[in-house]
């Protein structure tokens, strides 16, 4: 299982936004929508072993968590408007501390970063930062990972403190800063290649060069 957390600091926490203006009226919700697509879609299918968690911290009610479960997800297309519509439907639910299903495979609840991290107890937490350890060096040893990414503003000092206190390793996918959705694609590629080397992907045939 792969879980991916994206923190949206300005992402609106009510459903009264326009699907035609996700960058503006929805508080850069377009960034989160692109992350959802990069995390879940394959060329001719969907990654059923991936969950995406969107932590929305914008107005008017900061602290909403929307979860996309790849195993059960339906009605999602690769375009931003499609994922934006599912997010909007989730936000129109009267979310509380317990998960509420809005559409098949999409759940919503209230919560903050600490409560979200607590739900991953026992998992391998990996926090992406430009100066982190090269993920390529450890991708083959990682099991049951949870990746945490910021939006276009990164993460705050307080959020980083919470991540490090929770035991998150700091990793990087390359020497330059990339968009969050591009980082997700690179993460998947490294893990896919590692699984292919181990024979865990049907038809996979990638040989690792001799050291």
Curated annotation (Swiss-Prot):
Enzyme nomenclature, EC number: 2.1.1.257
GO molecular function, one term: S-adenosylmethionine-dependent methyltransferase activity
Protein residues bound to S-adenosyl-L-methionine: 128, 150, 183
Keyword presence, Glycosyltransferase: no
Alphabetical keyword list: Cytoplasm, Methyltransferase, S-adenosyl-L-methionine, Transferase, tRNA processing
Any Pfam family the entry gives: Methyltrn_RNA_2
InterPro entries associated with the record: Alpha/beta_knot_MTases (IPR029028), TrmY (IPR007158), tRNA_m1G_MTases_N (IPR029026)
Reactions it catalyzes: pseudouridine(54) in tRNA + S-adenosyl-L-methionine = N(1)-methylpseudouridine(54) in tRNA + S-adenosyl-L-homocysteine + H(+)
Predominant place of localization: cytoplasm
Enzyme class: transferase
Location of the protein in the cell: Cytoplasm
Gene3D superfamilies, sorted: 3.40.1280.10
GO CC annotation: cytoplasm
UniProt-listed GO biological process terms: tRNA methylation
tRNA processing keyword on record: yes
Oligomeric and partner information: Homodimer.
Protein family per UniProt: Belongs to the methyltransferase superfamily. TrmY family.
Function: Specifically catalyzes the N1-methylation of pseudouridine at position 54 (Psi54) in tRNAs.
Protein name: tRNA (pseudouridine(54)-N(1))-methyltransferase
Organism: Methanosarcina mazei (strain ATCC BAA-159 / DSM 3647 / Goe1 / Go1 / JCM 11833 / OCM 88) (Methanosarcina frisia)
